[in-house]
Each structure stands twice: as structure tokens, then as C-alpha cells.
């Protein structure tokens, strides 16, 4: 997370809105995507804890498009605030979980300990590639 945030914060204001940073997305759209997925993981893990139901988030492109559409009117400050608030909420949620939820061999542990960090890492690398070529 810290590395992802550091790389994203290092992108100039001029480049933040440019399409093509991550596929067709701008860096701002990537920030919304990452924040929305922090929220989605809370939902997935909570549902599993409550019901034992293992959920997959569905077709990722559909969910991504829905997330971006819902947040399309956020300005720069609101986008950064949404990213930080979502991560703070995610971390508060995770810190309140019992230890057994973090076993990487478990369903919840895979989401929390593998999927989320890899998500941050992957998009950090996307942004690094974008800034190197633009």
C-alpha cells in the first residue's frame, strides 16, 4: 500500500488525468478502482464470515465499470480522499478480525494476505510503467 501510494502521489497533476495509464484508465481512475476494491474485499470477507459463502466478485470488468461510473464525478481532492478513506476503513476492518482469518491457506487469508497486496503491487507497477513512458 505504502509503495503504491508513494508512486501514485509522485505522478504529476498533468499526467493524473491522462488516459492510457492502466489500459484505457487514467491514474485517477486507477485510484478509484483500488479504493473500490478495498471496499469489495470487505464485503466478500464479511459475507464469508457471516454465511460461509465463498463469493467471487463476478465479472471484474463489469464491477470495475460500475465502480468507475459511480465515482466519475469525483474531483482530484475527492478522489484522493476516497482512496485514503477506503484504505483506512479496510485497515480498520482487517485489524478487527480474529487471527485465524489471516491464514494464507484460508479463503479469507488469501483475499487479505495475497490478493489485496498483489492488487496494490500490480497497479503500482502499472503506474511506474506509465510514468516511465510518458
Q: What kind of feature is each model-predicted range?
A:
Residues 15, 68, 74-76, 108-112:
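Residue-level detector of alpha-helix boundaries and kinks
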